[in-house]
Amino acid sequence: MVKTLFQASAWNALEAGSFDGAVSVRELLRCADTGVGIGTALDGVITFENGAAYKTAPDGKVTVMRPEDGVAFAAAMVFDENAPEIALNGIDDLTSLKQMLAPFVQGNPNLFYMIKAGGVFKSVHTQSWNSCRKPYPMLSEAAKSWNEFRFENTRGNVIAVWCPRYVGGICMPDWHFHYLSSDKTQGGHVLDLSAERLHLKINRIGRFDLLLPQTTEFARCELREGKSAAACIRF
C-alpha cells in the first residue's frame, strides 16, 4: 500500500511570512499520527508522535497541544511501526546520521521518506522559534532570533522527513529533524546530536497531499522560486 505524506501549507509561503494556522491539530491528526511542524505565529516547534502533537515552546517547555490549536506548517503521515528495525551505531553528530541514512534514500531519491530513530542520546542540541506578532516578518528575518537547548543522556526519538529536491519551494528539500524525549519534557528542531546506538525505522512515501491555507496572509503572499531561508536557520 502506498503511503501518503500530508503537508499543511507550502514552505515558500512560510518563507514569505504566512504564519497563521493552515490547519488545526484536530484536522491534521485525522489523517496522520507522526511528523514535524511549526506552530501558529512561529510559537513553537511541533513533533507529532503516536497520534499526539507536542509543542516545544520558545522557552523550551514541552506541552501537549489542544485539538483547536493552529499549525502554520507541517509534514506528517500515518507511520508504519511494523517497518523493519535497523541498528545504527556510532552516531558522532547529525552529519554522520545523515550519511547513515543516505543509502536508504539513494535507491530512489525522488520519493519522500520519514524516519523514527530512537534510543539513548549522548547529546541533543535543539532550537525553537520566538513567536511573532502581526504584521509577520519574512522567515529569514524571524530566523535571526531563536532559542537553543542542550540535553545530555536523554532517551527519546528523532522524527525526520526527507523531501526530494524537485519539490523545493513547496517543500523543504532534504532532511528535517525534530526530537522528543520519552518523558515528553525535551524537544525541538535538531541542530546536532550524538548517540552510541539508535534503532531506526524508515517509511518510504509515494503519495503527497498538500493542504493550502485559507488565510488572508496566504492570499497576499507573492510565491515564487528563490533562495530558501533554510540557509539562514541552519536546517
Predicted stretch roles:
Residues 1-11:
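Hydrophobic, proline/glycine-rich low-complexity stretches
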Residues 78-89, 206-233:
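Compact, glycine/acidic-enriched structural inserts
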Residues 99-161, 168-170:
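Long, positively charged binding patches that form subdomain-scale interaction surfaces
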Residues 56-57, 125-126, 168-169, 187-189, ...:
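Short helix/loop capping segments that flank catalytic or ligand/cofactor-binding pockets
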Residues 172-180:
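Histidine-centered divalent-metal-coordination microenvironment in nucleic-acid enzymes
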Residues 13-78:
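N-terminal low-complexity or amphipathic/hydrophobic leaders
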Residues 56-108:
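A glycine-rich, hydrophobic loop/mini-helix early in the fold
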Residues 181-224:
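A hydrophobic, small-residue-rich beta->alpha segment in the mid-to-C-terminal subdomain
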